[in-house]
Protein backbone atom coordinates (compact mmCIF):
# COMPACT_ATOMS: atom_id res chain seq x y z
CA UNK A 1 0.00 0.00 0.00
CA UNK A 2 1.16 3.52 -0.80
CA UNK A 3 0.19 6.25 1.62
CA UNK A 4 -0.55 9.71 0.28
CA UNK A 5 0.89 12.90 1.74
CA UNK A 6 -2.34 13.73 3.56
CA UNK A 7 -2.21 10.46 5.51
CA UNK A 8 1.41 11.09 6.50
CA UNK A 9 0.52 14.62 7.60
CA UNK A 10 -2.24 13.30 9.87
CA UNK A 11 0.22 10.88 11.48
CA UNK A 12 2.74 13.69 11.98
CA UNK A 13 0.01 15.84 13.56
CA UNK A 14 -0.62 13.06 16.06
CA UNK A 15 -4.04 12.03 14.77
CA UNK A 16 -4.63 8.93 16.89
CA UNK A 17 -7.23 7.36 14.58
CA UNK A 18 -5.03 7.63 11.50
CA UNK A 19 -1.96 6.46 13.42
CA UNK A 20 -3.86 3.46 14.83
CA UNK A 21 -5.21 2.64 11.36
CA UNK A 22 -1.70 2.74 9.88
CA UNK A 23 -0.29 0.63 12.72
CA UNK A 24 -3.07 -1.94 12.24
CA UNK A 25 -2.39 -2.10 8.50
CA UNK A 26 1.31 -2.65 9.14
CA UNK A 27 0.65 -5.25 11.85
CA UNK A 28 -1.64 -7.18 9.49
CA UNK A 29 1.23 -7.56 7.05
CA UNK A 30 0.69 -4.64 4.69
CA UNK A 31 3.92 -3.15 3.39
CA UNK A 32 3.58 0.60 3.89
CA UNK A 33 5.27 2.62 1.16
CA UNK A 34 5.38 6.21 -0.02
CA UNK A 35 6.33 8.22 -3.08
CA UNK A 36 9.27 10.65 -3.01
CA UNK A 37 6.69 13.26 -4.05
CA UNK A 38 5.07 12.98 -0.61
CA UNK A 39 8.43 13.47 1.06
CA UNK A 40 9.03 16.63 -0.99
CA UNK A 41 5.53 18.00 -0.33
CA UNK A 42 5.82 17.48 3.41
CA UNK A 43 9.37 18.85 3.74
CA UNK A 44 8.37 21.91 1.73
CA UNK A 45 5.62 22.77 4.19
CA UNK A 46 7.48 21.89 7.39
CA UNK A 47 9.24 24.06 9.90
CA UNK A 48 12.95 23.36 10.34
CA UNK A 49 12.33 22.10 13.89
CA UNK A 50 9.85 19.50 12.54
CA UNK A 51 12.26 17.94 10.08
CA UNK A 52 13.75 15.46 12.56
CA UNK A 53 10.37 13.87 13.25
CA UNK A 54 9.55 13.91 9.56
CA UNK A 55 12.80 12.19 8.63
CA UNK A 56 12.29 9.58 11.36
CA UNK A 57 8.83 8.73 10.05
CA UNK A 58 10.02 8.43 6.47
CA UNK A 59 12.95 6.25 7.52
CA UNK A 60 10.46 3.81 9.06
CA UNK A 61 8.69 3.41 5.70
CA UNK A 62 9.75 2.06 2.31
CA UNK A 63 10.03 4.40 -0.65
CA UNK A 64 8.97 3.46 -4.17
CA UNK A 65 11.21 5.28 -6.64
CA UNK A 66 10.05 7.29 -9.59
CA UNK A 67 11.31 5.68 -12.78
CA UNK A 68 11.12 6.85 -16.40
CA UNK A 69 8.06 4.63 -16.88
CA UNK A 70 6.45 6.32 -13.85
CA UNK A 71 6.90 9.63 -15.63
CA UNK A 72 5.18 8.23 -18.71
CA UNK A 73 2.21 7.04 -16.66
CA UNK A 74 2.04 10.38 -14.83
CA UNK A 75 2.02 12.20 -18.15
CA UNK A 76 -0.86 10.01 -19.27
CA UNK A 77 -2.72 10.83 -16.03
CA UNK A 78 -2.19 14.55 -16.55
CA UNK A 79 -3.24 14.38 -20.18
CA UNK A 80 -6.42 12.58 -19.22
CA UNK A 81 -7.40 14.32 -15.97
CA UNK A 82 -5.63 17.69 -15.56
CA UNK A 83 -8.42 19.77 -17.04
CA UNK A 84 -11.45 17.71 -16.07
CA UNK A 85 -10.37 16.94 -12.48
CA UNK A 86 -7.66 19.57 -11.80
CA UNK A 87 -5.06 16.85 -11.25
CA UNK A 88 -1.65 18.31 -10.41
CA UNK A 89 1.77 16.86 -11.25
CA UNK A 90 2.48 15.61 -7.72
CA UNK A 91 -0.77 13.67 -7.52
CA UNK A 92 -0.26 12.32 -11.04
CA UNK A 93 3.17 11.00 -10.01
CA UNK A 94 1.76 9.40 -6.86
CA UNK A 95 -1.07 7.81 -8.88
CA UNK A 96 1.39 6.59 -11.50
CA UNK A 97 3.57 5.03 -8.80
CA UNK A 98 0.55 3.14 -7.42
CA UNK A 99 -0.47 1.99 -10.90
CA UNK A 100 3.03 0.92 -11.88
CA UNK A 101 3.52 -1.18 -8.76
CA UNK A 102 -0.05 -2.50 -8.57
CA UNK A 103 -0.51 -0.94 -5.14
CA UNK A 104 -3.52 0.43 -3.33
CA UNK A 105 -3.38 4.11 -2.42
CA UNK A 106 -4.44 5.27 1.03
CA UNK A 107 -5.67 8.86 0.84
CA UNK A 108 -8.27 11.20 2.26
CA UNK A 109 -8.55 12.92 -1.14
CA UNK A 110 -9.82 10.28 -3.57
CA UNK A 111 -11.00 13.05 -5.93
CA UNK A 112 -7.33 13.90 -6.62
CA UNK A 113 -6.83 10.41 -8.09
CA UNK A 114 -9.59 9.85 -10.68
CA UNK A 115 -7.64 7.20 -12.60
CA UNK A 116 -7.20 4.88 -9.62
CA UNK A 117 -9.66 2.16 -8.74
CA UNK A 118 -7.77 0.79 -5.72
CA UNK A 119 -8.17 3.59 -3.17
CA UNK A 120 -8.44 3.13 0.59
CA UNK A 121 -9.90 5.80 2.88
CA UNK A 122 -8.09 5.56 6.23
CA UNK A 123 -9.72 6.27 9.57
CA UNK A 124 -9.59 9.94 10.45
Residue ranges and their predicted role:
Residues 95-124:
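Acidic, PIN/NYN-like endoribonuclease modules and their adjacent C-terminal/linker elements
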Residues 7-8, 38, 70, 93-94, ...:
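Alpha-helix capping/helix-boundary segments
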Residues 40, 61-82:
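Acidic catalytic patch
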Residues 18-19, 39, 51-54, 71-74, ...:
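A general structural signal for well-ordered alpha-helical segments in protein cores
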Residues 1-34, 43-59, 123-124:
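Short, well-structured N-terminal submotif of metal-dependent ribonuclease cores
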Residues 4-5, 42, 74, 98, ...:
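Generic structural signal for small/hydrophobic residues in well-ordered secondary structure
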Residues 85:
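A short, glycine/small-residue-rich beta-strand->loop->alpha-helix junction that serves as a flexible
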Amino acid sequence: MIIDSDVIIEVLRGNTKTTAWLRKARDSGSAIRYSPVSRAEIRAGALVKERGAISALFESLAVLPIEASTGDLAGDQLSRFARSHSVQLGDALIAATALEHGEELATFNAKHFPGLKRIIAPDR
